[in-house]
């Protein structure tokens, strides 16, 4: 018998944990990812810092950025070219296999995507992307993005941005370096 339980798993397994541990105090961790918001005014150095937030630990983990919001008129090649500095990741066999697999699936299904060797970029409204893929979504107003992220708060670990007014936000390059008091899911 235990006084409390802590469990981690997928969104699906968390449903079972919630049921199984319903009568005792518990903390259940679910799938989460991090997102970034680009204003279009970022320097190359800031984009490289964002690259650390995307590619550190091969994009695995709740603090890894799996989705980037970009302005409607943003030239995404600026981001892609900056992130080419991480192309050495494609020399890692298992990471490269993920990119090759996703590229094959996208080509066979005629899905539009961009490729900068380090990763594939696909326009998609989902938060979590497969390993080797970064989703992006265009926005016209930051307030709309802000509202969307509040609605999806349960799916988001942190937000990487220079913009003000976003909950749990960190500057580019800081997603993988939480403070001691940055509790996962906000639970101590």
What are these regions (language model features)?
Residues 5, 38, 71, 145-146:
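Short low-polarity hydrophobic stretches
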Residues 2-15:
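Active-site phosphate-binding strand-loop segment of PLP-dependent enzymes
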Residues 14-130, 138-139:
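ALDH superfamily catalytic-core signature
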Residues 9, 40, 51, 59-61, ...:
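Residue-identity detector for glycine
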Residues 1, 20, 74, 82-89, ...:
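Conserved C-terminal structural/oligomerization subdomain of aldehyde/semialdehyde dehydrogenase
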């Amino acid at each position: 018998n235990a006084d409390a339980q802590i469990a981690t798993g997928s969104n699906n397994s968390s449903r079972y944990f919630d049921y199984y541990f319903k009568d005792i105090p518990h903390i259940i961790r679910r799938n989460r990812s991090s997102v970034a918001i680009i204003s279009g005014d970022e320097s190359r150095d800031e984009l490289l810092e964002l690259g650390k937030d995307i590619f550190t630990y091969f994009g695995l983990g709740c603090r890894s950025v799996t989705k980037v919001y970009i302005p409607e008129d943003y030239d995404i090649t600026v981001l892609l070219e900056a992130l080419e500095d991480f192309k050495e990741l494609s020399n890692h066999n298992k990471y490269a296999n993920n990119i090759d697999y996703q590229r094959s699936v996208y080509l066979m299904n005629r899905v539009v995507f961009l490729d900068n060797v380090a990763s594939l970029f696909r326009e998609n409204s989902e938060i979590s992307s497969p390993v080797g893929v970064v989703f992006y979504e265009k926005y016209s107003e930051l307030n709309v993005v802000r509202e969307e992220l509040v609605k999806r708060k349960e799916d988001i670990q942190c937000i990487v941005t220079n913009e003000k007014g976003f909950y749990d936000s960190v500057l580019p390059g800081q997603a993988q370096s939480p403070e001691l008091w940055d509790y996962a899911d906000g639970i101590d």
